[in-house]
Amino acid sequence: MKLKILTWNLNFFYDNWYDRIKSINKVLEKEIENNDIIVLQEATIPLLKSIDTIFGCLKSPLISYTPHYTFSDEIKTVFDKIATIFPKKKQQLTYVLKFIMDKIFGVVSWTFYNFGSSFQYLYFNYPLVWGCLFMTLLPLIFVCGYCFLGMMCVVNKNKIKTVVKSKFVGRPFQYCQFKFNNKRILLCNIHLNEASDTKGFKELKKIISFTNKIPHDILILAGDFNSSPKSSVYNYLTNNSFKSVIKEKHDKDIKTWPAINPKSCIDYIWIKGEDVKICSANIFGNALNTDHKGVKCCLDIK
C-alpha cells in the first residue's frame, strides 16, 4: 500500500516573501493532490487571521492541517499573564493583542520581502554584525518575525486518521501516529538547530528517546535537519538503521540548500522499520519558492 510523503522548509526569513508565497501555494496545490502527508518547516502562521489567508492551498477539502508555533509556550505565557491580570477582560484583550500582532505581521513581511536574504547572509557569515543589528536597530522586527514562525503538518484526511501533536526538545517538533496497511506508523516533522551540529544532535537524541516510548512498527523522520552527510546527526541515524530515501534510491545524497547552486544536503526523509520499500524519492522546488529544495517520496508499506 503506497504512502506518499513530502517535506519542505518554506523560510519566511527570506527575500521576496509576497512573490514567493504565491509560488509556494501553486506548488502545494498540486502536491496536496498527490501526497498523503506534507510536513512544512518555517511556515508562516498568523495569530488571528485564518492560516488559509496566507496558504490558500489549505482550503482543499481533501486535507486537514495542524500548525504549531515555534514559540507557542512563550505566546501562551503572555496570554495567560493577561488572563491573570485582567480575568474579566481576557477574551477582549487577547483579541486586541492578536489583532495588533497581525498588523505588525504586515511590517515584518515587508521587511523580509525586501531585506530577507541580506539578513540571512549576515546571520551565517557575520554573526557578530547580525547580533548587533538584532539587538539595536531592528529588535522588534526580528522578535515579531519569530512569533509568526512555526511548523505545519498537512494530512489527507480521507486516507489517514490521526491527531498531530507537538513536543519541545530545545526546539519543537511535530509527531503523529496512525495505522497504514495494518502497520503502526510514527511520523515526526523535524527542524533541528542550525547554530551548531552539537545542538542539533542533542535535539535529535531527545526526539529518538521520545519515539522509543511510543509503540510503532515504522518510524519516519522528515524535515530540515540542518545536518550534512558528515555531521553527527547523519552518522547517528545511519548507524542506527535509519535509511535516507534519497540516498537509497539515488546511491548518493542530493544537495538541498541553498536552492540556487546547492552546497549541502540538509533536508531528508529518514525511515526505519521492516516491510517498507522505497518506490521513488526526489527533490523539488527552486529559488522562486524558498531557499530550500524539498524532498518527497513514495513508500510501499507491505
Q: Where are the language model's segments positioned?
A:
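Active-site regions of metal-assisted phosphoester/phosphodiester hydrolases
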Residues: M1-I32, I37, I45-G56, S60-T70, ...
